[in-house]
Regions:
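Dinucleotide-binding Rossmann-like beta1-alpha1 core, especially the glycine-rich loop
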Residues: 1-43
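Helix-loop-beta segment of a Rossmann-like dinucleotide-binding subdomain
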Residues: 4-14, 42-74, 176-181, 239
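Helical element adjacent to the flavin cofactor pocket in flavoenzyme catalytic cores
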Residues: 23-26, 30-35, 54-112, 116
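C-terminal catalytic lobe of FAD-dependent flavoproteins
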Residues: 31, 156-157, 181-285, 340
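Phosphate-binding active sites in nucleotide-utilizing proteins
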Residues: 60, 73, 77-80, 86, ...
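Flavin-dependent oxidoreductases
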Residues: 91-164, 304, 310
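Rieske [2Fe-2S] iron-sulfur-binding domain
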Residues: 138, 319-389
Length: 389
């Protein structure tokens, strides 16, 4: 389709900074060689950052994801596709091999339906097999023009990733990382940690951009692409990209196109959402769902008690107990109060305030709600209940 998306090949570097990381890196190197991946030991990581060991993965690439998706949308509409925006799908009913896809004001029918929405909305097995995380990125202008001409990744926990990009003629270092589970750590602190790290390792002139995104981590490390488990034939899903949506999103198009057209695809069985119990990810499966159970119970206790709404600072949100009610309260800069139920409409966990993006985030399955309680990110389908004070 000739999509102009700033595509360019760049070498990728993965580097360690201590003995434990080096041992892990050596395992990755050996596994990569066995899999036929182009990898070799490197004398540089492309950055002004000290390292213990480093390996180069040749002919990696980067491209502009928005330009790419806009190009795909253009190609789709040119062959007759229709894109309907700002429409929440509430339900899918199937009758006589036809799927009735319902939204607030009507429905449409389809032979095949694909959930490409992180995890599908509602309560389903994929909510349990994926953990929601957020990642953070800074766009940094450097004093010394020491921008990397590669893709680099360290092995810290959480890790950092590095690349450069030109915006309106100005080159920027893109520094990402500080990942954490949605609704857990403080997003403001995540950005602060990245700023501190940047200042310690680069000659920073200014930080001109910052943003965050949500992704889902599958329990066994592989995405789920294929027929939706438990649903009627012809309902497909693609999720669990683990932050690699630019790769797995495109791969989804190939796999699902083959499945819909009755063709074989060598990756379909490996990535099937109905694959056998994820033995390799069983420990992670237990850990993540224990965390969900913990927040479901613990967050119902330890709520801040306030006597007056005046105690809440402007521009902030908190889950509090006020007049014997547990509430998610936000006070805007003019002092206007918005009070909501803090109970996520997905499975009943208690939401937490995200001060950076002004949202209520669920620590269990990653649902996010706007200040007025409307759904921003699934899997919840319904808004938080609103109270008048």
């Amino acid at each position: 389709y000739g999509i102009e998306a700033d595509f360019e090949y760049r070498d990728g570097y993965l580097f360690s900074q201590n003995k434990k990381e080096t041992e892990q890196l050596e395992e990755i190197y050996e596994s990569s060689k066995e899999a036929g991946v182009e990898v070799e030991k490197a004398a540089t990581n492309g950055l002004p950052i000290a390292f213990e060991a480093c390996y180069k993965f040749g002919r990696q690439a980067q491209f502009h994801p928005l330009k790419y998706i806009y190009g795909l949308a253009k190609a789709f509409t040119e062959i007759g596709g229709i894109i309907v925006e700002e429409t929440m799908i509430t339900e899918i009913d199937t009758a006589e091999k036809t799927h009735h896809v319902k939204y607030d004001n009507g429905e449409f029918t389809a032979k095949n339906v694909i959930w490409a929405t992180h995890v599908p909305p509602g309560v389903n097995i994929l909510s349990l097999r994926n953990a929601p995380y957020r990642s953070y990125v800074l766009g940094i202008k450097l004093q010394d023009e020491a921008y990397p001409d590669c893709l680099s990744y360290d092995m810290q926990e959480p890790y950092h990733y590095f690349r450069s990009h030109v915006i309106n003629g100005q080159k920027y270092l893109l520094l990402g990382g500080a990942d954490h589970k949605t609704g857990h750590d403080d997003p403001e602190q995540a950005f602060a940690d990245l700023e501190k790290y940047a200042g310690e390792n680069f000659k920073v002139a200014s930080i001109d951009f910052q943003w965050s995104s949500q992704y889902y981590v599958p329990v066994d490390g592989l995405p789920y692409i294929g027929q939706m488990p438990g649903d009627a034939k012809g309902i497909y899903v693609s999720t669990g990209f683990n932050g690699n949506g630019m790769i797995f999103g495109s791969l989804t198009g190939e796999i699902l196109a083959d499945l819909i057209n009755g063709k074989d695809n060598e990756l379909a069985k490996v990535l099937s959402p109905s694959r056998l119990k994820p033995i390799s990810g069983f420990t992670e499966f237990i850990k993540e769902n224990t965390d969900v159970a913990y927040h479901f119970v613990a967050d119902r206790f330890g709520t801040e008690l306030i006597e007056s709404l005046k105690e809440l600072p402007v521009g902030e949100g908190r889950v509090v107990k006020y007049e014997d009610e547990k509430l998610a309260i936000y006070k805007d800069n003019q002092g206007k109060i918005t009070a909501l139920s803090p109970v996520c409409t997905h499975t009943g966990c208690i939401v937490n305030w995200n001060g950076t993006e002004k949202s209520w985030d669920c620590p269990c399955h990653g649902g996010r709600f706007a200040i007025d309680g409307t759904v921003m990110t699934g899997p919840p389908r319904e808004a938080l209940k609103c109270y008048k004070l």
